């Protein structure tokens, strides 16, 4: 009986797939779109524009793109080539040096944390999406049950403060007066805090589960599962919509935004360069951190997605396209955000800095409030939150697939491959259950705690160790030859230098910067207690600790009479390291093929008829020339 690939019937998988056991992307566009959806997430919309205006406007673009060239693209290319060469997920690739397999487990832990709270953000976007399907947005006025006496809506003729606005000057006086006396709160802020979250006073006060959010969380996980029900075979089709439609929405919102009064002021505030700020270390640190985190490096997702590529796919080209697309999207989103915020600031008669925000405050408070000022505001709100949902889902697909692929590759038997859909369902159910505490009244505190600690400096450490393991333990010369065997050309000299020296140096700089700039987390005026911060550090360490723990375990289990012998055996590549298919095991890997085939029958070519036809492999190099490799079969 044939193997079931990614939950699909065998006949569907054997038409074009090179690796019949794991399956491949339907075509290269699916991989590129999936990777774009993975890299382009919520942070591109709600974090980058804020960092840009805070760090010198247009001047911030200079360090940002410098970090992209010297750190972002090289690391992206390294992870793609790593996964594609071995055709394995974030665990299986560490056959390259088994002692470092803990790095893969660390990536799984990080992806688990991110997947839990990221889907809660998506579920909140679902909630706002459904709430926008009204004639009047529910956060427009102050006449709702959840509003307080301090609420003062910019459109409220009968607000709780009982002011009657007759002109823009009166509106300005109202705003200034409220700031001095009542500390004005907007309807959107009260809707967010008092209706959606019903936020408690302390992180330890969980209160009740918010059933509407719980329902939206279930919807979110159901959508993710259905899109991954056949692995990359189904998600590869979904991304044609989820990865492209956000750009349609961004363009619609941009065109609408620039036609509004005050939009130019917002855009100028966003772009006007303050060149003196590029001399500040914090600006360079923010640029490096944003590049590193926004590309999804060290999460395990890039390795996983690339593992489903065909062996000779040009991942060098893909890494450049995807990285530049990610950064260009961030810049483009800034125009969309600040054109609307500029209009809002003009309407209120205040400076743009008074309405600018980042994170959940931008997505669920500031921007929704600005949308209430537009005609047909429910339409714009529906589009905005639908865009957030799609951006979040694109990342969530890869986070879940990273975990599922790691489990399936690690077990590796026919049964687990046949029932991969059940593994996906199991991981989705566990993710849903672990996300329930984040739908309580203290959920936002825990969400921000996980966001700040679970995937912060631990990612930097994981990425740094990965560079050291591949470049210095396995050996840069061997890795460069591996890439040449796979692509038909060695990595360009620039990337060789970056991988060995520049990128690890920048990663180390990010780590030092993160430590120096560390401040205890707070949410608005709420300061997190020490015990909560301790839990945050434990979450961060839980991924990093996998590396030394597994190294100790591997040394203990390795053969050898002395510690040095065990260490040497734990460090050197395992016998089954290399291309997954024997037809690709040429050069120095051909010498291991006979031994590997005898000891592992599954390593035999899965498509011998194809191999008989393809006696030579022609690979298109970056210079446009054809490189021919004779088949060793």
From Swiss-Prot:
One of its GO terms (cellular component) is plasma membrane. Glycans are attached at residues 158, 164, 173, 179. Coiled coil: none annotated. It comes from Xenopus laevis. Residues 588-633 are annotated as: Disordered. This is Sodium- and chloride-dependent glycine transporter 1. Residues 591-602, 617-633 have a biased composition (Polar residues). Keywords: Amino-acid transport, Cell membrane, Glycoprotein, Membrane, Neurotransmitter transport, Symport, Transmembrane, Transmembrane helix, Transport. The chain crosses the membrane at residues 31-51, 58-78, 113-133, 209-229, 238-258, 283-303, 330-350, 373-393, 429-449, 453-473, 493-513, 533-553. Signal peptide: none annotated.
């Amino acid at each position: 009986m044939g193997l079931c690939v990614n939950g699909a019937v065998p006949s569907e998988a054997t038409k074009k797939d090179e690796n019949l056991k794991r399956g491949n992307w339907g075509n290269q566009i699916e991989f590129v779109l999936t990777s774009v959806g993975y890299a382009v997430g919520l942070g591109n919309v709600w974090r980058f524009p804020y960092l840009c205006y805070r760090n010198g406007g247009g001047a911030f673009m200079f360090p940002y793109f410098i970090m992209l060239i010297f750190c972002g693209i090289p690391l992206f290319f390294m992870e793609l080539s790593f996964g594609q060469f071995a055709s394995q997920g974030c665990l299986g690739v560490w056959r390259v040096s088994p002692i470092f397999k803990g790095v893969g487990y660390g990536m799984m832990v990080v992806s688990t944390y991110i997947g839990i709270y990221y889907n809660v953000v998506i579920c909140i976007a679902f909630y706002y999406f459904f709430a926008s399907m009204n004639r009047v947005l529910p956060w427009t006025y102050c006449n709702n049950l959840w509003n307080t006496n301090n609420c003062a809506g910019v459109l409220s003729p009968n607000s709780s403060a009982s002011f009657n606005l007759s002109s823009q000057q009166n509106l300005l006086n109202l705003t200034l007066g409220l700031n001095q006396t009542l500390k004005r709160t907007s309807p959107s802020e009260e809707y967010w805090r008092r209706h959606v979250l019903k936020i408690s006073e302390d992180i330890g006060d969980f209160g009740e589960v918010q059933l509407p959010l719980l329902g939206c969380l279930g919807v979110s996980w159901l959508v993710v599962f259905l899109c991954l029900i056949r692995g990359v075979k189904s998600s590869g089709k979904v991304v044609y919509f989820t990865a492209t439609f956000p750009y349609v929405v961004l363009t619609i919102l941009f065109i609408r935004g620039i036609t509004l009064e005050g939009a130019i002021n917002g855009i100028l505030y966003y772009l006007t360069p303050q060149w003196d700020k590029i001399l500040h270390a914090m600006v360079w640190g923010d640029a490096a951190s944003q590049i590193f985190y926004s590309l999804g490096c060290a999460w395990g997702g890039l390795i996983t997605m690339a593992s489903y590529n065909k062996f000779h796919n040009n991942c060098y080209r893909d890494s450049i396209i995807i990285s530049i697309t990610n950064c260009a999207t961030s810049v483009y989103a800034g125009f969309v955000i600040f054109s609307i915020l500029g209009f809002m600031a003009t309407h209120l008669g205040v400076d743009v800095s008074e309405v600018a925000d980042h994170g959940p405050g931008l997505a669920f408070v500031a921007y929704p409030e600005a949308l209430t000022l537009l005609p047909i505001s429910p339409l714009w709100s529906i589009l905005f939150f639908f865009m957030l949902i799609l951006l979040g889902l694109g990342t969530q697909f890869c986070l879940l697939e990273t975990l599922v692929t790691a489990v399936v590759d690690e077990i590796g038997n026919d049964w687990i491959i046949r029932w991969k859909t059940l593994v996906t369902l199991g991981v989705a159910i566990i993710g849903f259950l672990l996300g329930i505490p984040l739908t309580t009244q203290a959920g936002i505190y825990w969400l921000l705690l996980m966001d700040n600690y679970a995937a912060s400096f631990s990612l930097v450490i994981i990425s740094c160790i990965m560079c050291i393991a591949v470049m210095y333990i396995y050996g840069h010369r061997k890795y460069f030859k591996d890439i040449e065997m796979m692509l038909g050309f060695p990595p360009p000299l620039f990337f060789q230098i970056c991988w060995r020296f520049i990128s690890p140096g920048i990663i180390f700089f990010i780590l030092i910067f993160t430590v120096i700039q560390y401040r205890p987390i707070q949410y608005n005026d709420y300061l997190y207690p020490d015990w909560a911060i301790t839990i945050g550090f434990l979450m961060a360490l839980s991924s990093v600790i996998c590396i030394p723990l597994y190294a100790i375990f591997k040394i203990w289990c390795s053969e050898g009479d002395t510690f040095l012998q065990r260490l040497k055996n734990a460090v050197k590549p395992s016998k089954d390291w290399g291309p997954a298919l024997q037809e690709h095991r040429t050069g120095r890997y051909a010498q291991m093929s006979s031994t590997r085939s005898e000891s592992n029958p599954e390593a035999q070519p899965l498509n011998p008829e194809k191999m008989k036809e393809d006696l030579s492999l022609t690979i298109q190099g970056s210079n446009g020339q054809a490189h021919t490799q004779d088949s060793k079969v």
